[in-house]
């Protein structure tokens, strides 16, 4: 049976952006939100991206929710999906969560589930690595920009925290649960997969 229960909720954008609408066509044309050092060019209007579809603290928001149950080895055993309404209890930062995981403090006291989340993320990571998953952990550059002039004043390596990895593991687990559900239902759906490497190219890699 399940001994861990992971809940993931994402904003229900489809409630506001109907298929074929002007908003839908514009979002298709843009394809993405674009993040710059000092600004963001959103895929959707700000009233949605930073308002009605943003999970702000202490405000009711429409979501698509998912519940995944794991056994004590991190193997998924149950899953359920449903529309819902949530009220976020706080907007946390990666740095704040990492501080709470490492040293406790006020944030850890207000959100005691963070240590449970850390333990589950470690379990999922270990299981994924045992399955042969690769983690390149490539360095990411962070640009230091003068907000007055727009000029780049420096570049430094962005620090990758376990808080980042925690969210990565949970979103991977959530996406895999959706994929399993659709596969079991025989529902046609585009999957983004990483097939096994070509043996010749793999041999070349090892020689270099």
Where are these regions (language model features)?
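Electropositive polyanion-binding surfaces
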Residues: 1-208
